[in-house]
A protein has these predicted regions:
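Aromatic sugar-binding surface patches on proteins
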Residues: 137
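Catalytic-core "active-site belt" of small-molecule-metabolizing enzymes
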Residues: 1-134, 146-174
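Short acidic beta-strand-loop surface patches of small beta-rich interaction domains
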Residues: 140-145
Length: 174
């Protein structure tokens, strides 16, 4: 479990200009929830009461710093959590799918099946270590971080959809 600073959150779907120190950008798809009720040590039975909306996004990491350095996750504009969020009932339909493409090629796809359970487990685990506050975001990586782009790419277009709606569409520029 790690925390990311607010400056890492990209809210406006802008292109990402890679820092000079980076030779590669890694990424991981995430499902996330907005905390709607403050709490500490939330039990599994009650976790669903602590969030009111969910979404899908991605986390990017400075690849040269992976896997053990916390600063790999602190670069500005590397937390892509698009708003507005979806009502939690949307995640009860396994036909709804999240997909991420890079330069038109499918990188990742998943259904909503099991996402609520995964998030609720994360809410329980994180609330043991830290107090949850209204408005906090809890995100869970759906797969291990892997290479998204490297300096040799010069430019890469990353786009994602959920429920046939565009979530984000931006360029990684080296």
């Amino acid at each position: 479990m790690c925390c990311r600073p607010d400056t890492s959150w990209e809210k406006e779907n802008r292109d990402f200009y890679c820092p000079e120190c980076a030779g590669a950008i890694h990424w991981a798809p995430v499902v996330f929830a907005r905390i709607s009720k403050a709490g500490k040590c939330v039990g599994e039975k009650f976790a669903s009461r602590y969030y009111d909306a969910m979404g899908f996004g991605m986390l990017m990491y400075i690849g040269d710093l992976l896997p053990d350095i916390a600063s790999a996750s602190c670069a500005d504009h590397t937390t892509i959590l698009p708003f507005p969020l979806y009502n939690t009932v949307v995640f009860d339909n396994p036909d709804n799918a999240y997909s991420v493409n890079a330069d038109g090629a499918l990188l990742y796809s998943c259904s909503t099946l099991g996402c609520r359970k995964t998030l609720e487990e994360a809410i329980c685990k994180s609330s043991v270590l830290t107090s949850l506050r209204t408005g906090d975001i809890v995100a869970v990586e759906l797969s291990e971080p892997c290479l998204l782009s490297s300096r040799s790419d010069k430019e890469k277009v990353v786009a994602a959809t959920f429920c046939d709606n565009d979530l984000f569409d931006f360029k990684i520029i080296w």
